[in-house]
Amino acid sequence: MQKTEDFIINRLKWKADKFGLPTQFAFYFNDLPLETKNHLVNQIDKLNSGTPVLLFTKPTKEWTLVCSRQVICSDNIKTVSLNISDIKRILPTAFDITLIGQPIDIKTVKKKSEWDTINIVDKHEGSNIFYANKGEDLFALWNILLMAKQLYE
């Protein structure tokens, strides 16, 4: 079944509500100041990205913008966009992903409450880092993207 853009936007907002957004570093795009909206819109290809819905930021100014068709991030050097329909896996960056399924010494791994990046692998096995504030904001982004990915399957 083909989902409409309005349906996807409403689902993204619904899931964000479930995670208690907005927070200090996670926002609904429509609630942002006009200057911030304009800055972000100038960073993206609105035709391909769809409607911007959610913005996740870090105190160090990296950001991830969740749109109706793409997720876009910037580390202040480069901007990366990925079609939500192309997401294959979302993985933690806190430890070596080759160790998944094997015993891990938890003393060497950063606590989940300190995680602030996720690794999104696309269908072509390309890998990109996406940003959110540590802890709850990151897990909100992760779960919102998992749901969005399912909407496009």
Identify the residue ranges that each predicted region occupies.
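Anionic N-terminal interaction surfaces
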Residues: 1-64, 121-122, 126-133, 139-140, ...
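Phosphoinositide-binding peripheral membrane targeting modules
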Residues: 52-105
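Canonical pleckstrin homology
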Residues: 98-141
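Nucleotide-binding motor/catalytic cores of P-loop/tubulin-like NTPases across gene-expression machines
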Residues: 12-16, 88-89, 115-117
